[in-house]
Amino acid sequence: MAGEKAEKPDKKEQKPAAKKAGGDATAPRALPAGAVKKSSSKAKKLRKSKPHCSRNPVLVRGIGRYSRSAMYSRKALYKRKYSAAKTKVEKKKKKEKVLATVTKTVGGDKNGGTRVVKLRKMPRYYPTEDVPRKLLSHGKKPFSQHVRRLRSSITPGTVLIILTGRHRGKRVVFLKQLGSGLLLVTGPLALNRVPLRRTHQKFVIATSTKVDISKVKIPKHLTDAYFKKKPLRKPRHQEGEIFDTEKEKYEITEQRKADQKAVDSQILPKIKAVPQLQGYLRSQFSLTNGMYPHKLVF
């Protein structure tokens, strides 16, 4: 008996070992780390190999086989339930209506007792002629308040090629932008006979050539009003002078001549300091056979 008692604890000790062995048998076998990575990479490849296909095959680029209503039924979009997003907007308080009339009590047995009276009385007299009311402009500003933008390629001192007008094809020096958005340019006059004048930036080609005019002082009175042409007076026919009348001709003022000399005297030394720049400004721009404007580099 003593021997059997000694053997029993051995069996108990073996049972948990058996359970562990049984547990190991049911559990999945451990695989090497490389095998796990390979299996995961294969799964990713399988997922990537299935591209998403549209249920509406394309007949021609931008045109599907089925219409929008047909695809609505094919996708069963009618089964979806849409709920509008809830907004936390406070309800606007209703303004109290201003009463236009007031009921007042009236004495007398035959007057009805009450009478409706307007708070705002109508005018006693009306205008004989209709005066037009000024309508509110919906964000439209007058031309004087428009924003003046200048092309990034046009900076003070840039040599420009004029494309329209009597000086088309000539190269000029840009001085500044005026209040109306027009460009103030000069030839100078001694080189290519282009005086101080205004031109629009749409009809100009900006070149990469520049003249240093940082120290050039431009008179402040050179504005749009300065260059605006004054209307010439037409002479009235008088008795005996029907055929002898002459039209008034435009003449350059002494102020214009003085301003032209003042500006050109400062720019000409800057131009002469750069070799071949005088000849470049004297020459005119023109296109010949085989020259394409969109391929030229100015």
Swiss-Prot record:
Identify residues that carry N6-acetyllysine. 249
Name its cellular compartments. Cytoplasm, Cytosol; Cytoplasm; Rough endoplasmic reticulum
N6-succinyllysine PTM positions read 104, 217
- Where does the record place Basic residues bias? 39-53
Q: Point out residues bearing the modification Phosphoserine.
A: 137
Molecular functions per Gene Ontology = 5.8S rRNA binding; mRNA binding; RNA binding; structural constituent of ribosome; tRNA binding
Query: Single GO cellular component annotation?
Result: large ribosomal subunit
Q: Annotated cross-link Glycyl lysine isopeptide (Lys-Gly) (interchain with G-Cter in SUMO2) - which positions?
A: 5
Renumbered to this chain, the Basic and acidic residues biased-composition regions fall at 1-16
Q: Which UniProt keywords apply?
A: Acetylation, Cytoplasm, Endoplasmic reticulum, Isopeptide bond, Phosphoprotein, Ribonucleoprotein, Ribosomal protein, Ubl conjugation
Q: Where is this region: Disordered?
A: 1-56
The Gene Ontology biological process annotation of the record reads: cytoplasmic translation
State what this protein does.
Component of the large ribosomal subunit. The ribosome is a large ribonucleoprotein complex responsible for the synthesis of proteins in the cell.
What is stated as this protein's family in its record? Belongs to the eukaryotic ribosomal protein eL6 family.
Q: How is the subunit organization of this protein annotated in UniProt? A: Component of the large ribosomal subunit. May bind IPO9 with low affinity.
Q: What is this protein called?
A: Large ribosomal subunit protein eL6
Organism listed in the record: Rattus norvegicus
